[in-house]
UniProtKB/Swiss-Prot annotation:
Binds as a heterodimer with protein bS6 to the central domain of the 16S rRNA, where it helps stabilize the platform of the 30S subunit. Part of the 30S ribosomal subunit. Forms a tight heterodimer with protein bS6. GO terms for molecular function: small ribosomal subunit rRNA binding; structural constituent of ribosome. Belongs to the bacterial ribosomal protein bS18 family. InterPro entries: Ribosomal_bS18 (IPR001648), Ribosomal_bS18_CS (IPR018275), Ribosomal_bS18_sf (IPR036870). Pfam families: Ribosomal_S18 (PF01084). Keywords: Ribonucleoprotein, Ribosomal protein, RNA-binding, rRNA-binding. It comes from Acaryochloris marina (strain MBIC 11017). One of its GO terms (biological process) is translation. GO terms for cellular component: cytosolic small ribosomal subunit. This is Small ribosomal subunit protein bS18. SUPFAM superfamilies: Ribosomal protein S18.
């Protein structure tokens, strides 16, 4: 029977994901401004869904850029 390493979520299950917490949200977007997929972030499905909503809301409120044109 193969042994699979259990993945640990970078955000604790009870911690809220808020659109105002820009430092937390920046950890989950690329340098170009794209949202990282769940297989890279290691989040649960629920956390990834909440994170995506928070990032999109922060973009609409101009807390995060839609795209990053640096480089």
């Amino acid at each position: 029977m193969p042994y699979y390493r259990r993945r640990v979520s970078p955000i604790k299950p009870g911690d809220p994901i808020d659109y105002k917490d820009v430092d937390l949200l920046r950890r989950f977007i690329t340098e170009r401004g794209k949202i990282l997929p769940r297989r890279i972030t290691g989040l649960t499905a629920r956390q990834q869904r909440d994170l995506t909503r928070a990032i999109k809301q922060a973009r609409v409120l101009a807390l995060l850029p839609f795209i990053n044109r640096e480089g």
